[in-house]
Amino acid sequence: MSIPVPRPGIMELRPYTPGKSTAAGLGRVVKISANESPFGPSQKAIDAFHKAGGRMHRYPDGDATELRNAIGAVHGLDPARIVAGAGSDEILYNIARGYAGPGDEIVMSEHGFNVYPIVTHCVGATLVTAPETDLTFDVDAVLACVTERTRMVFIANPNNPTGSYIPADEMRRLRDELPGETLLVIDSAYAEYVQRNDYSVGIGLVDAADNTIMTRTFSKIYGLAALRLGWAYCPPAIADVLNRLRGPFNISTPAQRAGKCAVEDQAHVAASCDHNSVWLPWFASHMQALGLHVYPSVANFVLVRFPDAPAKNAAAAMAYYMERGVIPRETGGYGLPSCLRFTIGREDELRQAVDIARDFLAKS
């Protein structure tokens, strides 16, 4: 009997593997694997979510009007150029659907976010990977990969899982030297955490031309990962394309209401930033003091490289952490098998993570 056959390339797609959230035999664990907010959502967002529960029998606002208006007010943007998505993943996928297909190429950097290969293969395009310099997006290397078939370039700035970033002048150079018909997609999921004067989220580049998109998420600093909520700021013509591709009611009412209140509660955002600005350097310096290599990060996580010796490598360290109920993120799927990524969690979680690393490295 014959059976349906998927499109060519689909079975070559490697599914996204999220960070672990449980450890065998342990009830309570410390999860510092997914770059989630240690504070959770704003209380105002929680209240709005519960209040919206009474309207679950009604379809949501298909245009997410109040949410887009709130985002526009906070960031000084035209709401008509904002597209809401069920997580920024949906938006990234729809960008690829709208602008690439078989015979086209999509370029990303060597250790970029793992969703980019997935959306590329989903639309039948060819992925081109540019080498990085010191685990940082290399503009010249990316430009060298661009051909007449290149439809778009994905850049996460800051990058996940490395925590590195490129400054505004390099981002501008990238846009200026890309062909006008090549779409630049700036994934600014961790933008709120960056405290560098030479950093730009990408809004200016979107405003300056009709070939650049900036995407954002509510999953990180806003603490709404479970609701799947993201947004994009686009040129009007691209916003029109993305609105044609998204589902008619793609954002639930509870997610819209919670997102609106979350983005309006900038005091909660500021508190999260303050925590990160203290505990990221603390954690990095204490891991370095143990002799580990910690890569510079401007996000809410750090990438740590472990020794190559079998008993002291990242795989052994991961097992040691898991046995003790602390879960960092393995990064072999990003081409970084010698590293683990640690979310900047609460103070007690970070102190425990350092203590475990110390014990692991000291054991014979």
What is each model feature region?
Residues 277, 288-324, 340, 344:
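Conserved PLP-binding catalytic core of the aspartate aminotransferase-like
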Residues 1-58:
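N-terminal "arm"/small-domain region of PLP-dependent enzymes with the aminotransferase-like
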Residues 78-82, 102-105, 149, 181, ...:
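Short acidic capping loops at alpha-helix termini that bridge into adjacent secondary structure
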Residues 98-155:
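PLP-dependent aminotransferase-like
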Residues 169, 316, 320-325, 329, ...:
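PLP-dependent enzyme catalytic core of the Aspartate aminotransferase-like
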Residues 42, 211-295:
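PLP-dependent aminotransferase class I/II
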Residues 121, 139-148, 161-184, 188-221:
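Active-site pre-lysine segment of PLP-dependent enzymes
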Residues 60, 64-105, 123:
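Phosphate-binding glycine-rich loop
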